[in-house]
């Protein structure tokens, strides 16, 4: 009887165009090991899927880890309702293409109260539509482990987070109460109600991610590549101005130029950069001389002192 799964799901994710260089191969092996360890140790793992480049690499590694079987856990997308339209289209196509079990969660309280980044500010919006929403989804699914795509090179609080990041029953993170990790040995013992966030990409850098995408021919949301796009300058960021919900403030004008995004999130809170990089090779060359973190383009990382660590302590990704 013919297999009814989508044809692309049957393709072998292990067949790269050319052998990986030793550095990328070592990173890949470590990530696959982490995926398999968590899947073996925990009863109900889930993968947090935010649709960006790191999530795309994470998904590719998960497919490799369990090939020729399907990815043995669901993907969870915490949707705020303010993602770039291109991200949602890419998410839906990816789920169909690889026959994924995709869970979408939107905070019902936030939706009912019409919480937006414009009316409530980035801090309150993120707390309600991301952190609170994520806690709701994890509780509803009774998940005891959640894979995330965070990397230590992204931001200071993430630099000190373990690969197995332990969370209390209310999903809080205490950086002073984490377990040592010797070599590739991880202690996944938890009490009832506790959970773990596992980060297979912890030791990767932004350039590693892009070189791996190039080597493995991993598809991405087109927003990562430069193109003439409309934008407005607001709070020191270039905000995409192609969504009708974006209202211009006094003195603002729509501009057009070659821009791209190093990081993707909610469009009103994510700044673009001026760029001519339209190909993978050009993006990598651009990153090799970059002097600031990709997270500089996220308003939520600078809306208050110690912003990211505070959010993570409260249960953020």
UniProtKB/Swiss-Prot annotation:
It catalyses: sulfate + ATP + H(+) = adenosine 5'-phosphosulfate + diphosphate. One of its GO terms (biological process) is sulfate assimilation. Signal peptide: none annotated. Pathway: Sulfur metabolism; hydrogen sulfide biosynthesis; sulfite from sulfate: step 1/3. Residues 1-21, 298-317 are annotated as: Disordered. Pfam families: PAPS_reduct. Keywords: ATP-binding, Nucleotide-binding, Nucleotidyltransferase, Transferase. Its EC number is 2.7.7.4. It comes from the Bacteria. Coiled coil: none annotated. GO terms for molecular function: ATP binding; sulfate adenylyltransferase (ATP) activity. HAMAP family: Sulf_adenylyltr_sub2. Belongs to the PAPS reductase family. CysD subfamily. Heterodimer composed of CysD, the smaller subunit, and CysN. With CysN forms the ATP sulfurylase (ATPS) that catalyzes the adenylation of sulfate producing adenosine 5'-phosphosulfate (APS) and diphosphate, the first enzymatic step in sulfur assimilation pathway. APS synthesis involves the formation of a high-energy phosphoric-sulfuric acid anhydride bond driven by GTP hydrolysis by CysN coupled to ATP hydrolysis by CysD. This is Sulfate adenylyltransferase subunit 2. It comes from Rhizobium etli (strain ATCC 51251 / DSM 11541 / JCM 21823 / NBRC 15573 / CFN 42).
């Amino acid at each position: 009887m013919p297999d009814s799964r989508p044809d692309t799901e049957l393709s072998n994710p292990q067949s790269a165009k050319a052998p990986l260089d030793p550095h990328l191969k070592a990173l890949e092996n470590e990530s696959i090991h982490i995926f398999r360890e968590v899947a073996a140790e925990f009863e109900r793992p889930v993968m947090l899927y935010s649709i960006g480049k790191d999530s795309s690499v994470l998904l590719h590694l998960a497919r490799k880890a369990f090939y020729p079987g399907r990815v043995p856990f669901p993907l969870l997308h915490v949707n705020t309702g303010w993602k770039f339209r291109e991200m949602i289209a890419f998410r839906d196509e990816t789920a169909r293409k690889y026959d994924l079990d995709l869970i979408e969660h939107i905070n019902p309280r936030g939706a009912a109260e019409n919480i937006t980044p414009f009316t409530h500010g980035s801090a309150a919006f993120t707390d309600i539509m991301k952190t609170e929403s994520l806690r709701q989804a994890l509780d509803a699914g009774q998940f005891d482990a959640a894979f995330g795509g965070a990397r230590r090179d992204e931001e200071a609080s993430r630099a000190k987070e373990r690969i197995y990041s332990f969370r209390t029953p209310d999903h809080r993170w205490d950086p002073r109460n984490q377990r040592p990790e010797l070599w590739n040995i991880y202690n996944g013992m938890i009490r009832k109600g506790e959970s773990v966030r596992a980060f297979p990409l912890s030791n990767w850098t932004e350039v590693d991610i892009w070189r791996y995408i190039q080597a493995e021919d991993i598809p991405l949301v087109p927003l990562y590549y430069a193109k003439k796009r409309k934008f407005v300058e607001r709070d020191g960021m270039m905000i995409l101005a192609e969504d009708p919900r974006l209202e211009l403030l006094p003195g603002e004008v729509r501009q057009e130029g070659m821009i791209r995004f190093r990081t993707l999130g909610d469009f009103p809170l994510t700044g673009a950069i001026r760029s001519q990089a339209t190909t993978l090779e050009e993006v990598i060359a651009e990153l090799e001389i970059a002097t600031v973190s990709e997270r500089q383009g996220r308003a939520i990382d600078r809306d208050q002192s110690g912003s990211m660590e505070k959010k993570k302590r409260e249960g953020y990704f």
